[in-house]
Amino acid sequence: MAIDKITTASITSGVLPVNTPCFFASSSADQTINNNTTTKLTFSNEVYDVGGVYNNSTYRFTPGFSGKSNISAGLWTYDAQSSFFRVDLWLYKNNSMIVSTQQRYTSSNTTVERQSSSFNVTVQHDADDYYEVFGLLRTVDSGSAEILVGSGNNAIFDNYFHAHKIIE
């Protein structure tokens, strides 16, 4: 267990392990996803980025250390025509899918207007591995759908990408 590594000396010296680097990024603008098209999700609003591990122009997390990190992401989608029947949210590591969440309805007669998906996973990585989040939406009418954000500093973080170091 990790707790056995915290000693009396480390507590009295004030030197405790920290779970940084870490970051939290959210969507800063609405994003359109075309029907049945794998799309990289754009999280350009860095709420915090301790250690400079997130690039808000490539939307990539590169840990900068070898070890383990906890990674999570959330996606909230909207289709005004209420025609979603599939929503996928994926985590890619070095351009290969490693996590897949899928919400599918068995009949095209069963559709929704709004859909939320998320994942939370602990991964082992090298310092130069990189992670990205992708999504795929399917609609009955083959139309595009939106990933919507709020406005200003009061925006709700429905669309986000987050990671922090796991202390071992």
Where are these regions (language model features)?
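Short, low-complexity N-terminal tether/leader segments at secretion or assembly junctions of large
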Residues: M1-P17, H164
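Extracellular jelly-roll beta-sandwich "head" domains, especially the C-terminal globular C1q domain
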Residues: L16-E168
